[in-house]
């Protein structure tokens, strides 16, 4: 990945404990971003593990967003959120998405709203293209600052 410096690699895991074990043995070039999945409050502990990794960009993927989140975003450079898609998709509540966005705004963390998924903001089932990407009437496409230097 370091040799392909013109690409940005976004590596995502649910196995944050394993990530912490492996992180010291890996090189972390600035084009390798690392993230953890945080679907609901049950998985917030993954964020503490993520903070231990010396990547230039550490991010959260809150997709599918399956519950309300109360986050400490210190040391996090980006948050992605989205609803679940697929035949057995569970709906994402509007309040969960707006609360997460508001936490990002409060803490100065870029927020990217990827999709509503298989349900719209009222919880009605639809196709992803029908449910769209707007949150409170806006597209949230914020990205992290790629020039951050790790300590």
Q: Regions from the language model: what does each represent?
A:
Residues 1-67, 77-92:
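Core AdoMet radical
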Residues 66, 70-151:
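Auxiliary Fe-S-binding modules of radical SAM enzymes
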